[in-house]
Regions:
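Expand to "…catalyze enediolate/carbanion chemistry for C-C bond making/breaking, isomerization
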Residues: 1-110
Length: 110
C-alpha cells in the first residue's frame, strides 16, 4: 500500500504513517502539498523542500520507499539526492499533451 502525503499535517505525521503495517511507501502529491503549505501558513510550516526531506527521511527510517510525482526528468537527480527512490515523471495527460503538441507542431501549415 502507498500512503499519499499531501498536507502539512501528513508531513508532520510521516514517521507515524511510515510505521503503519502494510504501508510500503510514502508518496508525495506535490501539487496538493504545495497548495496546503500556501493555505496554512500558521501551521508549523516547513518549506516545500524541507517537507520533502522530512518525508524521504521518514520513509528511509522505516525501510520504506519514498516516492514523488515530478514534472520533468530534469528534477530526477535533485530528488534522488533528497532520498526519493520511487520517481514518476509527468502524468498521463501531460504526456499525451506533449505528444499532441509534437505531432501538430511538426505538421506542415495548410
Amino acid at each position: 500500500m502507498v500512503a499519499q502525503i499531501e498536507s502539512a499535517a501528513a508531513v508532520r505525521r510521516a514517521d507515524e504513517i511510515a510505521r503503519v503495517e502494510g504501508v510500503d511507501a510514502l508518496f508525495v502529491g506535490p501539487a496538493d502539498l504545495q497548495l496546503d503549505l500556501r493555505m496554512r501558513p500558521d501551521l508549523e510550516n516547513c518549506s516545500y523542500a524541507e517537507c520533502l526531506k522530512v518525508v524521504a527521511g521518514s520513509a528511509a527510517r522505516a525501510g520504506k520507499a519514498a516516492g514523488i510525482l515530478l514534472r520533468d526528468v530534469a528534477e530526477i537527480a535533485q530528488h534522488r539526492e533528497m532520498g526519493f527512490n520511487m520517481l514518476a515523471v509527468d502524468s498521463d495527460l501531460g504526456i499525451l499533451r506533449k505528444a499532441y503538441l509534437a505531432v501538430t507542431g511538426a505538421a506542415p501549415a495548410p
